From Swiss-Prot:
PANTHER family cross-referenced by the UniProt entry: L-ARABINOSE ISOMERASE (PTHR38464:SF1)
Function according to Swiss-Prot or TrEMBL: Catalyzes the conversion of L-arabinose to L-ribulose.
Gene assigned in the entry: araA
EC primary class: isomerase
Family designation: Belongs to the arabinose isomerase family.
UniProt-recorded Gene Ontology molecular function terms: L-arabinose isomerase activity; manganese ion binding
Domain of life per record: Bacteria
Keywords: Arabinose catabolism, Carbohydrate metabolism, Isomerase, Manganese, Metal-binding
Any single GO BP term: L-arabinose catabolic process to xylulose 5-phosphate
Name this protein carries in UniProt: L-arabinose isomerase
InterPro entries: Ara_Isoase_C (IPR024664), AraA_central (IPR055390), AraA_N (IPR055389), AraA_N_sf (IPR038583), Fuc/Ara_isomerase_C (IPR004216), Fucose_isomerase_N/cen_sf (IPR009015), Lara_isomerase (IPR003762)
Record-linked HAMAP family: Arabinose_Isome (MF_00519)
Length: 500
């Protein structure tokens, strides 16, 4: 079973009538076999749909139009089995609004040395057919991923899957609705931004709602539904008997369950995939949602604290891209440092870290929340699972958006954190904290990020290219002088690209 049950990518092979029916029959047969191989592979998480070979400008235009109008199609894989004159592709590529990947492969891995003849050479022509197609893509300035190698290899299939996941994320971005309860934290700069510009570039919509509307949904929750929700908590988390035997703590837990159920219904009714709130805007609420927000994220909803709608969007998009993979995705904040032999960052937030990143079964506890509404709030406590991860931040630079990515290595804390009443993750940025933090700051990266152990750098590269957004990567090879030059060069490129 594919991780993406409804979404699909189309596989379109280019050729021309010049070759005659016998060769075109072989082209179609080979294409169907490649599609079958992709669909049988566990490495590719999305259904690949075979489409008949296109041999003329009209056929190419028609399949591009059809891809645009099919809600389940998130992108198109294009392969030139033979030579397909690229002027035939101009109208179709101009029409195509879905992302496309150029697969530069051939059906057979090895040459039949003893038997090869001109019939074979004329049938298996992707070595120069794909170069012709590549030219027109470059001439038309079309962003696309080019995957090179034999279609049966693990590396090629992994790249195909990375692109499919990015296409699913881009599709989600085009359809995403984000609900904002309250505004940004007062005086904070980086969480601000141009929502109209974001909708133009990324597709997602951001809508504001009053706390009164949310409270109406919360107050409509029935007592028996709250009781059933408490039973779910008991089955999913480690909860002490003390909490259940303490009338006050149990009441706080019931109020949190009520918030979760009301908020869930509000988001469902409005078809929202992400939301934000702010501890400064909680009129009428019993507290800042803690457990409620954590559980919503665990169920795939994006979240951004203090009104951070850009991070909420990215958390949701990355959760969609990561379907079926091990590891989770969460809203995150760089909170405090551990300077030592290897400098480290302790990431956390006031309450809202997703349990999908937990190393062990989370504990559900009630602790005092001292910012905004000062009250006791139920929350899940855990530490993040060790392993590779990434932090992704989206910022508004005024004339464009920039996505910043830092590769990390999450580690197991050397000691317990018995007095820390929030979930956390401890990581070592690549190449090290000194360079990574300096680069992040030079790039303008936010203190909030979308943290993930399910998504790779390549997924974000593919997504950023689909969005036409600037992306800067901080990894093991980053050096500050070169990084600052990259930022300067990007400023010129993206400034000129708008007018070219």
């Amino acid at each position: 079973m594919k991780a993406f049950k409804q979404k699909q990518v189309w596989f379109v092979t280019g050729s021309q009538d010049l070759y005659g029916p016998k060769v075109l029959e072989q082209v179609a047969k080979n294409s169907e076999q490649i599609v079958h191989g992709f669909n049988q592979s566990d490495a590719i998480s999305m259904e690949v749909v075979y489409k008949p070979t296109v041999k003329s400008p009209r056929e190419i235009y028609a399949v591009c139009q059809a891809a645009n109008s099919d809600e389940n199609c998130v992108g198109v894989i294009l392969w030139m089995h033979t030579f397909s004159p690229a002027k035939m592709w101009i109208a179709g590529l101009n029409e195509l609004s879905k992302p496309f990947m150029h697969l530069h492969t051939q059906f057979n891995a090895e040459l039949p040395w003893a038997d090869i003849n001109m019939n074979y050479m004329n049938t298996h022509q992707s070595a120069h057919g794909c170069r012709e197609f590549g030219y027109i893509g470059t001439r038309m300035r079309k962003e696309r991923k080019v995957v090179v190698g034999h279609w049966q290899t693990n590396d090629v299939q992994a790249q195909v899957d990375d692109w499919c996941r990015a296409a699913a994320g881009w599709n989600e971005s085009q359809n995403l609705r984000i609900a904002r309860f309250g505004d940004n934290m007062r005086q904070v700069a980086v969480t601000e931004g141009d929502k109209v510009a974001a909708q133009i570039q990324f597709g997602y919509e951001v809508h504001a709602y009053s706390l009164g509307e949310l409270n109406d949904a919360i107050n409509a929750v029935a007592d028996n539904d709250i009781t059933a929700q408490i039973d779910r908590y008991a089955s999913e988390y480690v909860i002490s008997n003390e909490l259940f035997n303490d009338e006050y703590q149990l009441d706080r837990l019931r109020k949190e369950a009520q918030i979760e159920l009301g908020l869930t219904q509000f988001l469902k009714d409005g078809e929202f995939g992400a939301f934000t709130n702010c501890f400064e805007n909680l009129t009428g609420m019993t507290g800042l949602p803690g457990l409620a927000t954590q559980r919503l994220m665990a169920n795939g909803i994006g979240y951004g604290g203090e009104g951070d709608w850009k991070t909420a969007a990215m958390v949701r998009i990355m959760k969609v891209m990561g379907q079926g993979r091990t590891g989770g995705t969460s809203f995150m904040e760089d909170y405090t440092y551990n300077f030592g032999v290897t400098d480290q960052v302790l990431g956390a937030h006031m309450l809202e870290v997703c349990p999908s990143i937990a190393a062990a079964k989370p504990r559900l506890e009630v602790h005092r929340h001292t910012i905004g509404v000062r009250c006791d709030v139920p929350r899940l406590l855990f530490t993040g699972k060790a392993g590779p991860a990434i932090n992704v931040s989206t910022i508004d630079l005024g004339n464009r958006f920039r996505i910043i990515l830092n590769e990390l290595d999450t580690v197991t804390p050397p000691q317990e954190l018995p007095n820390l009443p929030v979930a956390s993750a401890l990581w070592e940025p690549r190449p090290n904290l000194s360079i990574a933090a300096a680069a992040w700051i030079h790039a303008g990266g936010a203190h909030h990020s979308a943290y993930s152990q399910a998504i790779s750098t390549d997924n974000i590269v593919d997504f950023a290219e689909m969005a036409g957004a600037e992306l800067v990567i901080i990894d093991a090879d980053t050096r500050i002088r070169q990084f600052k030059n990259e930022l300067r060069q990007n400023s010129v490129y993206y400034g000129l690209a708008r007018g070219l």
